[in-house]
Amino acid sequence: MSKKINRNDPCWCGSGRKYKVCHEMFDDKIAKIAHQGHIVPTHNLIKNAEQIEKIKESAKINIAVLDEIQKTIHEGMSTAEIDKIVYDMTTDMGGIPAPLNYEGFPYSVCTSVNDQVCHGFPSPDVILKSGDIINVDCSTILNGYFSDSSRMFCIGDVSPEKKKLVDVTKEAMLKGLEQVKPWGFLGDMGQAVHDYVSVSYTHLRAHETRHD
């Protein structure tokens, strides 16, 4: 955590209010949680109201792009075409595709088809067929603020097994989101997802690249 400041100093969050009437009680609670051995966020990870609004503005582009993909995705389309739509629409709206050129990644989006778990590379050689399921993972930067979301799409006639996978995954995500609340733990979200999916599937993907 940050160095202790005086109670009458301006709060570290930038609100202009005195620390004692702004984040002092918050920091005291964080300190108690840290003392119990839990990992706690540093001040720079805690966003104020203005920063949250800027993240929401970034997310508006991100969601608009996914909505456009939902309208246009179809059998016979290549995943490279999806990448172009994402790049064109994101930049037209004033944003930057976050994956593009990140550590050399040459695409604006990740496209994962069927049994590809995540972070697939778009390609003109990957043509969507009836029966495919595809995850389109989209991330946007707007004025330095990031947003990130993905969406699953079913192409044409999808088998009951694949449809079940998509439906269970969506419901599991919603169960996890129910646990996103002030002073909750990320582990609560993961546990809710695990518990729900375990009812439908005996095998879970236990290890994968994570977002910190």
Stretches found by the model and what they are:
Residues 45-91:
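Intrinsically disordered, low-complexity, positively charged segments
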Residues 47, 112-145, 210:
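Acidic/histidine-enriched ion/cofactor-binding microenvironments in catalytic or ligand-binding pockets
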Residues 103-115:
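Short, basic/aromatic beta-hairpin or loop at an interaction surface
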